[in-house]
């Protein structure tokens, strides 16, 4: 049973006011975004970049997905190096990627022990992926939810063709992919050498 001395709710036709002698309630207006309606074959939703500095991984990631026909790469950004951001903005300017600012939650309370970000899993990754899903689900035929260190190589040289082949079987519940871990020391990394030495096999 609620105590009417603590909180009183007054209903009106146009607004609702909350009155309390104990708790101050802040009301924030949530931004409203329209869903993308442009028809796209394949879109990727990339987990938020946080304190990101590994440019070798990032630009290899973007170029490989571009090469195999990804229509749009929606990259969520919390924080990256300034020079990396400048290059990303050039990619966005030419329509290759979409940059989505993704800020950490602010602490409304002055108590430093209370941090809402500590209650979020993987820097609020799930919320970013859900936003991307609702933004593109009416537009894209296929949506990839991926991290910046994950590169999917299609067998037909086209993501869209691969996914279409997979969906022809209506009695399959899930798919498994061969997974390889590759790592090159940053001091030995050459961007052009990466593309010259990699070969795609069936």
Ranges and model annotations:
Residues 61-72:
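Short, acidic, metal-binding catalytic loop of nucleotide-sugar glycosyltransferases
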Residues 1-31, 39, 122, 126-130, ...:
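Catalytic-site signature of metal-activated, phosphate-bearing donor transferases
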Residues 32-43, 50, 81-145, 154-156:
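Active-site-proximal specificity loops/subdomain of glycosyltransferases
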Residues 77-78:
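Acidic ATP/Mg2+-coordinating residue in the GHKL
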């Amino acid at each position: 049973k609620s105590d009417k001395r603590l909180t009183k709710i007054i209903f009106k036709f146009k607004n609702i006011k909350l009155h309390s002698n104990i708790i101050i309630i802040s009301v924030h207006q949530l931004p409203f975004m329209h869903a993308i309606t442009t028809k796209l074959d394949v879109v990727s939703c990339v987990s938020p970049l946080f304190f990101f500095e590994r440019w070798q991984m990032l630009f290899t990631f973007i170029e490989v997905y571009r090469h195999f026909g990804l229509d749009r790469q929606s990259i969520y950004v919390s924080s990256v190096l300034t020079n990396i951001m400048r290059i990303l903005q050039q990619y966005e300017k030419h329509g290759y990627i979409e940059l989505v600012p993704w800020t950490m939650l602010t602490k409304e309370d002055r108590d430093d022990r209370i941090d809402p970000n500590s209650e979020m899993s993987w820097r609020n990754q799930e919320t970013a992926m859900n936003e991307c899903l609702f933004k593109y689900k009416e537009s894209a035929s296929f949506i990839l939810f991926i991290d910046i260190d994950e590169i999917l190589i299609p067998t037909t040289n086209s993501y869209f063709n691969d996914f279409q082949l997979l969906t022809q079987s209506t009695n399959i519940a899930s798919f498994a992919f061969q997974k390889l871990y590759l790592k090159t020391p940053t001091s030995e990394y050459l961007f052009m050498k990466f593309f010259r030495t990699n070969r795609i096999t069936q």
